[in-house]
């Protein structure tokens, strides 16, 4: 299947400053150098697309976050695809307000550097304030995430380790939801 034809650098990083952060030099260039070294190496083995999937913590304003990604991509010519984790399962995210602002700025950085912009939606829900333990997310919320991501890209994937497994009624639940619309 075409979606499995390529390389994925698994180390997850984010735009926040916890615990240390990659926002400033020399950490930013150290991260970019690592990503470029790995991407160039795997492409030397097989010249397929290289994908990364960092998390969007919204650790800086959207415009600065876009510039930050631009600085990384300027140093990583062998990175082909970004699947940005939307952090939509972590609460305190307004899909209609927060995500479009960050998606637009990060997509600009991708476009300027020849990187495909994609979104990795979180289809689970787990929050620390208010405390919500890991669970499936309502289909209306998932549909909203897909709609917002679809405003910026056709490259959308799903991240969830708890909600798409046998016994959670995910497939049948979604099918019923769509039939009822």
Regions found by a protein language model. Give the residues of each.
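Glycan-processing catalytic domains of CAZymes
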Residues: 1-181
